[in-house]
């Protein structure tokens, strides 16, 4: 990834296959290059963020699209949850026993009809179904749904909002910052 703080406009332009021009009689080309540098850096940053929430695995991407379509949940939200939960590691198992891409607890997985939480298709299907249930329960409030996904709906209800658990508060902030970017 290009580091715009240490990169000149001409080198940024060159990196994206664009031409760089200089002019001794006018600052307008320099200003245009600086504008382009900012635009290219912003574009690079946005592309970098988008790439961070791609699995790079066609079968996982396909499972995400299928679940998003089936449950009416934004694909970008599902990807942001997976990125936070497992870093797109289908074999991830937490210390608490949560498993797979969307880190389903065994009892939750079972209640969602997921027989193998380490199977990417089943995990994404079950995790998205659960995320949709939380979105419905909290009237589409993404932050509340994410808090419930992480800490359980009982805790969200008990505290009347995002629980005062540092882990849950950080979880919601991290996912929403990627999702709303």
UniProtKB/Swiss-Prot annotation:
GO terms under cellular component: extracellular region; membrane
Annotated knockout phenotype: Mutants exhibit wild-type swimming motility in liquid, but they exhibit a severe defect in flagellum-dependent swarming motility. Mutants are not defective in flagellar assembly. They have a slight but statistically significant reduction in the number of flagellar hooks and basal bodies.
Q: What is its EC number?
A: 3.2.1.17, 4.2.2.n1
Active site positions: 85
What triggers expression?
Expressed by the motility sigma factor SigD.
Entry's Gene Ontology molecular function annotations: hydrolase activity; peptidoglycan lytic transglycosylase activity
Temperature-related behavior of activity: Optimum temperature is 37-40 degrees Celsius.
Keywords of the record, alphabetical order, are: Cell wall biogenesis/degradation, Hydrolase, Lyase, Secreted
Q: What Pfam families does UniProt report for this protein, alphabetically?
A: SLT
- Kindly state which reaction or reactions the protein catalyses: Hydrolysis of (1->4)-beta-linkages between N-acetylmuramic acid and N-acetyl-D-glucosamine residues in a peptidoglycan and between N-acetyl-D-glucosamine residues in chitodextrins; Exolytic cleavage of the (1->4)-beta-glycosidic linkage between N-acetylmuramic acid (MurNAc) and N-acetylglucosamine (GlcNAc) residues in peptidoglycan, from either the reducing or the non-reducing ends of the peptidoglycan chains, with concomitant formation of a 1,6-anhydrobond in the MurNAc residue
Domain comment text? The N-terminal domain is important for secretion and protein stability.
Family membership noted in the UniProt record: Belongs to the transglycosylase Slt family.
This protein is called Bifunctional muramidase/lytic transglycosylase CwlQ
């Amino acid at each position: 990834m290009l580091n715009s703080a240490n990169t000149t406009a001409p080198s940024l332009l060159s990196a994206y296959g664009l031409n760089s021009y200089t002019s001794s009689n006018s600052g307008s080309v320099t200003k245009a290059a600086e504008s382009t540098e900012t635009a290219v850096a912003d574009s690079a940053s946005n592309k970098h963020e988008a790439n961070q929430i791609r699995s790079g695995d066609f079968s996982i991407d396909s499972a995400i699209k299928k679940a998003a379509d089936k449950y009416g949940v934004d694909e970008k939200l599902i990807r942001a949850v997976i990125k936070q939960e497992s870093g797109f590691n289908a074999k991830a198992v937490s210390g608490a026993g949560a498993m797979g891409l969307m880190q389903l607890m065994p009892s939750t997985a079972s209640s969602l009809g997921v027989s193998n939480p380490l199977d990417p298709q089943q995990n994404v299907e079950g995790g998205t179904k659960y995320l949709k249930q939380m979105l419905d329960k909290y009237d589409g409030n993404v932050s509340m749904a994410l808090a419930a996904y992480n800490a359980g709906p009982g805790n969200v209800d008990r505290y009347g909002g995002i629980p005062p658990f540092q882990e849950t508060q950080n979880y919601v902030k991290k996912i929403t910052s990627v999702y709303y970017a």
